[in-house]
From Swiss-Prot:
Native source species: Verminephrobacter eiseniae (strain EF01-2)
Stated family: Belongs to the NAD kinase family.
Protein's cellular compartments: Cytoplasm
Active site: D80
Keyword NADP attributed: yes
Reactions accelerated catalytically: NAD(+) + ATP = ADP + NADP(+) + H(+)
Binding site for NAD(+): D80, G81, N154, D155, R182, D184, T195, A196, Y197, S198, L199, S200, A219, Q253
A molecular function GO annotation: ATP binding
Gene3D superfamilies referenced in this protein's UniProt entry, alphabetically: Probable inorganic polyphosphate/atp-NAD kinase, domain 1 (3.40.50.10330), Probable inorganic polyphosphate/atp-NAD kinase, domain 2 (2.60.200.30)
Protein name: NAD kinase
Amino acid sequence: MTSNFRHVALIGKYQASSAGAIGESSRQALDGIARFLQHQGCSVAIEVETASNTGLLHYPSLTVEDIGARCDLGLVVGGDGTMLGIGRRLARFGTPLVGINQGRLGFITDIPFDTYQATLPPMLEGDYEEDSRPLIQACVMRAGQVVFEALAMNDVVVNRGATAGMVELRVEVGGRFVANQRADGLIIASPTGSTAYSLSAGGPMLHPSIPGWVLVPIAPHTLSNRPIVLSDATEVAVEVVSGRDVSASFDMQSLASLLHGDRILLSRSAHCVRFLHPQGWNYFATLRKKLRWNDGDP
């Protein structure tokens, strides 16, 4: 078979234990995928941290920047968290990503591990569905200076401390004052993140084709304070008015401690994450499967 993707990078979440050991099954799984790709005519490299943690050093290893510059495809083996992390880092290169699920839900790593040998060959020949997901560009402003910057694919969450009371947050959209919200926190989620923490907090699911965000209060003091869907073409600003131990998290993978008066500015990034799915993939089938809709129906 001649693959449309000649240079493929494998990225996995295979963290070494405190003793430096790693499960043999995890190593074998990644090695098996690499050998399979080689049999499909692909040149295979492994992301450098993945290679180090698995001990798979007989393949070329590449940094994320090298993957973006030199590889036609990234194959992510793990769960949604693994995909979120690498997706943010590769978005600026436009490298397409395919996910093989070894996590739990697998909303964005949607190929089951036990089916990859049947699913991948048609995709490597160009038979796939492409799906672009926008990123949120966020920065924390303090006294007029940027003190923290991050990208998020899922969400930005402003939270109170674990032992603190409610926070008060001033919310502006497009430079217009919306409200001061008293709550345990506030979630600003993309369509991708609308099926994550936002959904658990009572927010709606946004179809990935919708160019919008959803603002979801966490346990608000006022019951009329409900989620609101916004266009992602406008900037959202969230200012910390009061509260102790307030922080902002970005995809739950990076964290910024906040002070009173800090402003979190959010806008749509210029970069998108490119997902490739098996032919016939659709969003509603994913919802049915992952959320177990219609379980028990004949």
